[in-house]
């Protein structure tokens, strides 16, 4: 392929542009996944206690893939500008490996969206919240994490339980085993607080008087951020894969026309 041909130059420009987009997407993917694994909403203890934190695994893969895509886009641009078959061959091999990792990340993140159900967090809350009799240290660690996370959620976001305060009444729980029903119909964090973070009217809260306890559940506050992150990791990654596929296809065609 003659390198001074204007058509070839135009095609090279398109491929370089395609790789620039891949590099920018790689940086964006890395930033998105770093934001996710930094756990801005402090919800990781709830996932850890389910023994299924694959969505975080998908995000860590996304960080690796994003960095690799940026580096490989630079390699691809150099190979295209120099019309080097060896550089482009290395680009293809490495890109296919990274592509496979990103496919795995997208599939993992997409399938996790159906995992965040109300029953999952309800069962976990009932079993682990204020459970002081775990079978081992690992469960104690998880119970403490779940308890602290729920205390913060209910106090900070003015909610109570997964579906509402009735969760603490309708179901058997470790909390109910540890506390008297009359004194603790639900955790103190479910009460409306004053500026000192003390119940505004404890007796009214215990009796369930409207305005003195929170009757909204916390499920949306838990599943919302998790689903958004899972959606972002999965579908932004999928969009990158689609774009990369066509850039790779065009680069392979260009590589096949380079003279030895």
Curated annotation (Swiss-Prot):
Residues 1-15, 82-86, 251-260 are cytoplasmic. GO terms for cellular component: apical plasma membrane urothelial plaque; extracellular exosome; membrane. It is a multi-pass membrane protein. It is found in: Membrane. SUPFAM superfamilies: Tetraspanin (SSF48652). GO terms for molecular function: structural molecule activity. InterPro entries: Tetraspanin/Peripherin (IPR018499), Tetraspanin_EC2_sf (IPR008952). It comes from Homo sapiens. Belongs to the tetraspanin (TM4SF) family. Bladder epithelium. Keywords: Glycoprotein, Membrane, Transmembrane, Transmembrane helix. Residues 37-60, 108-229 are extracellular. This is Uroplakin-1b. It holds the Pfam family Tetraspanin. The keyword Transmembrane applies. Gene3D superfamilies: Tetraspanin. Component of the asymmetric unit membrane (AUM); a highly specialized biomembrane elaborated by terminally differentiated urothelial cells. May play an important role in normal bladder epithelial physiology, possibly in regulating membrane permeability of superficial umbrella cells or in stabilizing the apical membrane through AUM/cytoskeletal interactions. Heterodimer with uroplakin-3A (UPK3A) or uroplakin-3B (UPK3B). The lineage of its organism: Eukaryota, Metazoa, Chordata, Craniata, Vertebrata. Coiled coil: none annotated. N-glycosylated with high-mannose oligosaccharides. It comes from the Eukaryota. GO terms for biological process: epithelial cell differentiation; response to bacterium. Its main location: membrane. The chain crosses the membrane at residues 16-36, 61-81, 87-107, 230-250.
């Amino acid at each position: 392929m003659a390198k001074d041909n204007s058509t070839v130059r135009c095609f090279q420009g398109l491929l370089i542009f395609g790789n620039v987009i891949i590099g920018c997407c790689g940086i964006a993917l890395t930033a998105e996944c770093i934001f996710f694994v930094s756990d801005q909403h402090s919800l990781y203890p709830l996932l850890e206690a389910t023994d299924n934190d694959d969505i975080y695994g998908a995000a860590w893969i996304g960080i690796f893939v994003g960095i690799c895509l940026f580096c490989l886009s630079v390699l691809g641009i150099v190979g295209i500008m120099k019309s080097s078959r060896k550089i482009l061959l290395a680009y293809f091999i490495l890109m296919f490996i990274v592509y496979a990792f990103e496919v795995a990340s997208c599939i993992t993140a997409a399938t996790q969206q159906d995992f965040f159900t109300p029953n999952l967090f309800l069962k976990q809350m009932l079993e682990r919240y204020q459970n002081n009799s775990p079978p081992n240290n690992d469960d104690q660690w998880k119970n403490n994490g779940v308890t602290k996370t729920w205390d913060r959620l209910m106090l900070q976001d003015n909610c109570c339980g997964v579906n509402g305060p009735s969760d603490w009444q309708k179901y058997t729980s470790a909390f109910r085993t540890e506390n008297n029903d009359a004194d603790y119909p639900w955790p103190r964090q479910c009460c409306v607080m004053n500026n000192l973070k003390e119940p505004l009217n404890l007796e009214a809260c215990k009796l369930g008087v409207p305005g003195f306890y929170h009757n909204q559940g916390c499920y949306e506050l838990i599943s919302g951020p998790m689903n958004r992150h899972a959606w972002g990791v999965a579908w932004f990654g999928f969009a990158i894969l689609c774009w990369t596929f066509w850039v790779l296809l065009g680069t392979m065609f260009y590589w096949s026309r380079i003279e030895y």
